[in-house]
Amino acid sequence: MPEETLRVAALGRPFTLGMLYDTRQDKLIPGPSLWDRKTLQKNTDDTSQRSCNFHITASDSIDSKSSLLDVEASLKASFLCGLIEVGGSAKYLNDQKKFKNQSRVTCQYKTTTNFKQLSMTKLANLDEQQKGVIEKSSATHVVTGITYGANAFFVFDSEKLDASSVQEIQGSMEAVIKKIPSFDIQGKVDIKLTEEEKALTNKFSCKFFGDLILESNPATFEEAVKTYVELPKLLGEKKENAVPLKVWMMPLKNLDSKAPEVKAEVSTGLVKNVENNVEDLGTVEMRLNDCLADRVSKNFPQIRKSLRSFQRQRNNYTSALQQAIAKTLPSIREGKEDESSLKKLLEDREKSPFSHEKLSKWLDHKEREINVIGSCVDMMEGTNTKIVPNQSELDEEVLAPGVEDALCFVFTSLESADSCLKAMQNYSRSLELRSTDEEPWYYSNEVLTKMRKKAKAFHDLAKPLKDSSSVRFLATAIANEKHKGATIYHYNEGILVTDDFSKPPVPPVETIKDKSALMWYACDLSLDPETVNYNLILSDDNKKATRAAKQDYPDNPARFDVYPQVLCKEGLSGRHYWEVELTEDYNEDKGVGVAYKQIGRKGKQHINLGMNAQSWCFGVDAVKSQLFSGHNNKWVSFPLASIGFKRVGVYLDWPGGTLSFYNTESNTLTHLYTFHTKCTESVYPELDAS
């Protein structure tokens, strides 16, 4: 009984009528033919088969791509294991998103032109020479029909996105790309987009996979539209540039009973299992690329090294698995093996270090590690902290001329032993991902809490000193088993003082002479525009207040409405040091100090700094040319020293119950006055120009 004709996708392969084909290997057999060219031409029927389709898909799965190219299960299995090399538009099958967090939309243009087939009734009887050709080849089929036309795929990719915006961007991309056919006005390009759509299309790239030869491939949306409009012309006036799209093949067994044949096919379910495994390994690659593109892996070589090692192992395993399937598949089709051998290959993967579970778990761990490190780095934002990749560059920074002190936030556990990578490298010993009693440092709540606490402390140290030329703030990774997760190194004059920095104790406040004693207690303050009086103007990022004519500020409950005063935004407890620079104009009283948040804001009665129980003030009296201190409307006067009162340092020891003021000059401090008081809530630094 004659076997059924086989129908397969051409996939860019150079099929011709009468060509021999081995379906066990899915391999074209060029060279000897059963019939000469003249006989083939004489027995060929050519019929018109005009069609044109435009299709949009947001799926990037193997199944979706195979469907667009009309690839059936058996041929798909051969493609997945690398038995066949595709060309033309079918190269689209090999292309996948680089990142998991990336939007992709694909536009397919497909046209068919004609169908050619051999009239086999006159060719079915073979002579001995023709049968000899079959015997000498490995062919199982002969090409008897071909549908011609062309496929073109425009693949539009967004840039790498946050996971939360992938679906939204993809939907917007799909809506714009669906408009492409409407931009073709009788063979001319007329692109009409809103400003929002233009902004969107400017952010995604285009790749082209087609059967027609272009002068240059489109890389942008606009270029893609122009190419789309030109595609019908590229087929040629007589459609001479059309290529095989679909191929019909007759089993040679129908012509010669001794011809080789396919004994068995792999079941559709098992092909789907192969597809799932290949796709899973592809997803691993995308997640790896997401990790490699993260700033953490770019800044920390230890992370990048482990990712690259994992990537190499994954690539090697994927290649080995495909080669094993490519060897097994033809044997099953020839009847030398059954499906169980292919099933075993896939089952062995699940028992190996390359199982879905273990690869996913390794990536989960690495993504967690990157996120933990990234969260600490984020906490250093706005501090001019420099990330240095290695010990050599760290030494350069701490030994740089003019650098007296350097604090370095050190990630200490990035080079921890990775049992999963070891298992991959020693596949013969199938180790577990991690021993059950070993908790990765980045999953320890205790370690994470400590790291974030240190990162916050580092930020609070670095921000107020970010413009200091004598102090450097750095971040790096150095293995240190004593401090799991992270610690802070302190260098003084290029020498490591401690690998676990904490603020040094402060000497008695009246005895402090050197600013370095208070350096690590410096804080970064900003004046609060909501509280500024109408006769003050704020500038320099709310770091400076200047007396001025009355301003048209909106009224609000927090604003001082009579006296030129302003509070800072930051409420302080703990120990803090800051400095205030005053103009040398002694025609105006000036006061600096702190106040509780509930200090009065409206009217004249006891609102000034120091005139109430909610505030403490130290300043200069312009009329008497003397210094004064005040709290709860009790005032003490002091002579104004010859050095003046240009820059005042303020040290708040909230738990110790002191508020001290110093005249500052270069690195020298001169103690002026100390309030001894026990604060009951946070205090806000204040300036008073009244």
Give each language-model segment a name:
Residues T5, L11, R24-Q25, S352, ...:
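Alpha-helical interaction segments
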Residues T16-P30, Y489-N492, D499-P507, N542:
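Polybasic, low-complexity association/targeting segments
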Residues F79-G82, T268-V271, E275-V278, D294-S297, ...:
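Intrinsic disorder
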Residues M1-R333:
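Membrane-permeabilization and membrane-interfacing ectodomains
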